Amino acid sequence: MAKKSMVAKWKRGSKYKVRKYNRCHICGRPRAVYREFGLCRVCFRKLASEGKLPGVKKASW
């Protein structure tokens, strides 16, 4: 989990528009964030397995 201070800092916005930091919208994790969904791999997997992400299904071949 991200530190509460980092999440608060991220939600507040930045001084410059160039400073964009990809974080998970749910937990605030800074790494392994899917841009298309705005979620980290952990939250993505959890929501996808629960069926809460439309158009996402488990791969099988």
UniProtKB/Swiss-Prot annotation:
Q: Which cofactor(s) are needed, names only?
A: Zn(2+)
Instruction: Note the superkingdom of the native organism.
Output: Bacteria
Q: Which GO terms describe its cellular component?
A: cytoplasm; small ribosomal subunit
Residues annotated for Zn(2+) binding in this entry:
24, 27, 40, 43
Q: How is the cofactor bound?
A: Binds 1 zinc ion per subunit.
Q: Which UniProt keywords apply?
A: Metal-binding, Ribonucleoprotein, Ribosomal protein, RNA-binding, rRNA-binding, Zinc
Asked if the keyword Disulfide bond belongs to this entry, the reply reads no
Is Oxidoreductase among this UniProt entry's keywords? no
- Gene Ontology terms: biological process: translation
Classification via Pfam families: Ribosomal_S14
Read off the Gene3D superfamilies from this record. Answer: 30s Ribosomal Protein S14, Chain N
Q: Name one GO molecular function term.
A: structural constituent of ribosome
Tell me the protein family, please.
Belongs to the universal ribosomal protein uS14 family. Zinc-binding uS14 subfamily.
Can you state the subunit structure given in the record? Part of the 30S ribosomal subunit. Contacts proteins S3 and S10.
What function does the entry list?
Binds 16S rRNA, required for the assembly of 30S particles and may also be responsible for determining the conformation of the 16S rRNA at the A site.
Question: Could you identify this protein by its name?
Answer: Small ribosomal subunit protein uS14
- Species this protein is from: Kosmotoga olearia (strain ATCC BAA-1733 / DSM 21960 / TBF 19.5.1)
